Structures are given as C-alpha cells and as structure tokens.
C-alpha cells in the first residue's frame, strides 16, 4: 500500500517547475486571476460535502449538532462504537443503502472533475473528505479518501479492509485473524487521524494550483490545506456555495451551486492550457 501511494505521488511530482517565479506572473481575466500559462501544471483538488449535496447525499450534520437525530459522540467516535456497535452499524447501514439508491448519481461537478483528470492525467490528484463513491462513478481514479469509504469495512483488530455493499450486523466478524474480530465501518471518526496525510502534505508542497470545492473550512486538518498550498507557491481557488470559514485565504473565488461553478471553472481552465 505504501509503495503504491508513493508511486502515485512520484507521478504527480513530474516536471516540477519554479513555483516562486510564477507568483510574479499573473494574467487578469475579469473577476478571476489565473497563473501565467504554465507547462504541465499540477492540480490538487479538495472536495467536501457540498459537491455531493446536489446528488442527494445528505450532510447529516444539523444546526443543532445532531446526525440524523443522533449525537455525534454516539455514532461517529470509537467510544460510541465500543458502547453500542449495533447503533453505529445501523446508522452507517442506512447511509450505505441511501448511497446505492438509483436516484443517487454523480452530478455535473463530479463529471467536470473527471474531465479535468482525463486532461491532466498524472498531474491531477483529488483529495476528498466525502465517504461516498460518486467521484469514482464519475470517472476519477487518482483519489485519496481522507475520511474513508462507506462501501468498505475493516477488521477492528488487524485493520484489513474489505469491500462491503450490504448491511453490517454486530455479529459479523472478520476471519483474517486467528481470533475473529468485529467489523467496523471504514470511516474516520472524530478523534481519529485522517488517512493518507503524509501523501497529501507532500502533494500540497508540489501543487501549482489548489482548488477547494464544497468545503466548510471548519474541519481540520483539511481547513489548513489552503494555507499549506500557499506556503509552497500554489495558486488557490475556492469554488463553493458561499464563502467558507477560510475563504479569505484564497486568491480566486467563485460562489454558487457546485453543479454550476465547477463545470464553468473547469471549461475555462482547460481552454487556457
């Protein structure tokens, strides 16, 4: 797994240019600022719940802090799983069922990012906070799911990851170990370290352009990615329904529904290559 990750990152690193030099070279187009035409730009995209909301995926987190009438502590923490695994499995079973409903499909924003990856190839990396598979279904392949994946489970003892499309019952066990261990959702809960962070920070240090889509800017470490990218000279872009908590950090900003602003941005970007 580790070698595959660094192989993917080495491809993203190809043709590294002088990052600081391009900061002094800007072209102004109306309300947008884009870097001077770069040869083989490396693009890192971060997506959050806002990109999937238009596909019918509920964000679950309500204004009162409840997730589907449950306290976060009960359904999205290791302690909650230890106290009541049945409740936690039922919660994620419902989310898994919803994701696989026929009406849940990638929207125009997902499809635009797949188009962008097709054009850029190995110079594109997508980091998502979402645990759905809509990016994959749209056609993206170079993806890091930093918060895990809903259609996977893992052994609570060995960490082995398994594909899983159906419900998970408390009595379901993983038999990869000498002693069968409970299965848990392959998702990152509060208090746990997000996945792929070493690879993500290395990619942030090499990106020419950093784009955040549908993120609130409330959740760290992802909220700090824009600052990290800027430190290394990347041009930063926010595509969101409204300004995020860290919106002031971005050099370029476009606001509106993801299904509208993302395809528009991608089309203009690709025309400038």
Swiss-Prot record:
Residues that, per the record, bind NAD(+): 48-67, 129-132, 214-216, 240-242, 258
Protein name per its UniProtKB record: NAD-dependent protein deacylase
Catalysis performed (reactions): N(6)-acetyl-L-lysyl-[protein] + NAD(+) + H2O = 2''-O-acetyl-ADP-D-ribose + nicotinamide + L-lysyl-[protein]; N(6)-succinyl-L-lysyl-[protein] + NAD(+) + H2O = 2''-O-succinyl-ADP-D-ribose + nicotinamide + L-lysyl-[protein]; N(6)-(2-hydroxyisobutanoyl)-L-lysyl-[protein] + NAD(+) + H2O = 2''-O-(2-hydroxyisobutanoyl)-ADP-D-ribose + nicotinamide + L-lysyl-[protein]
Induction notes from the record: Most expressed in mid- to late-log growth phases (at protein level). Has 3 promoters, P1 (upstream of nagK) gives rise to a nagK-cobB transcript, P2 (within the nagK coding region) gives rise to a transcript able to generate both CobB isoforms, while P3 (nucleotide 44 of the long isoform) can only give rise to the CobB-Short isoform.
Impact when changing residue 1 to A: Complements a cobB deletion, produces only the short isoform. Has deacylation and phosphoribosyltransferase activities
Sorted UniProt keywords: Cytoplasm, Metal-binding, NAD, Transferase, Zinc
Cofactor(s) in the UniProt record: Zn(2+)
């Amino acid at each position: 797994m580790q070698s595959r990750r660094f192989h993917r990152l080495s491809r993203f690193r190809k043709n590294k240019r002088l990052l600081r030099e391009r900061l002094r070279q800007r072209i102004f187009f109306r309300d947008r600022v884009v870097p001077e035409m770069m040869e083989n730009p490396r693009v890192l995209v971060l997506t959050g719940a806002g990109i999937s909301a238009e596909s019918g995926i509920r964000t679950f987190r309500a204004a009162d802090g409840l997730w589907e009438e449950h306290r976060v502590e009960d359904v999205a923490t290791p302690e909650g799983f230890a106290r009541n695994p049945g409740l936690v499995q039922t919660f994620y079973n419902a989310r898994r069922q919803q994701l696989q409903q026929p009406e849940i499909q990638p929207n125009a924003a997902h499809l635009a990012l797949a188009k962008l990856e097709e054009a850029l190839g190995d110079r594109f990396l997508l980091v998502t906070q979402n645990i759905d598979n809509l990016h994959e279904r749209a056609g993206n392949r170079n993806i890091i799911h930093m918060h895990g994946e809903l259609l996977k489970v893992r052994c609570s003892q060995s960490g082995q990851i398994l594909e899983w499309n159906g419900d998970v019952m408390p009595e379901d066990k993983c038999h990869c170990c000498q002693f069968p261990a409970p299965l848990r959702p392959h998702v990152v809960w509060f208090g746990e370290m997000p996945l792929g962070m070493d690879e993500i920070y290395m990619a942030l240090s090499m990106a020419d352009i950093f784009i955040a889509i549908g993120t609130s800017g409330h959740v760290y470490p992802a909220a700090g990615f824009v600052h990290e990218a800027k430190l290394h000279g990347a041009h930063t872009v926010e595509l969101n329904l409204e300004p995020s908590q860290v919106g002031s950090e971005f050099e370029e900003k476009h606001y509106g529904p993801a299904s509208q602003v993302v395809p528009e941005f991608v089309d203009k970007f690709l025309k400038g290559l």
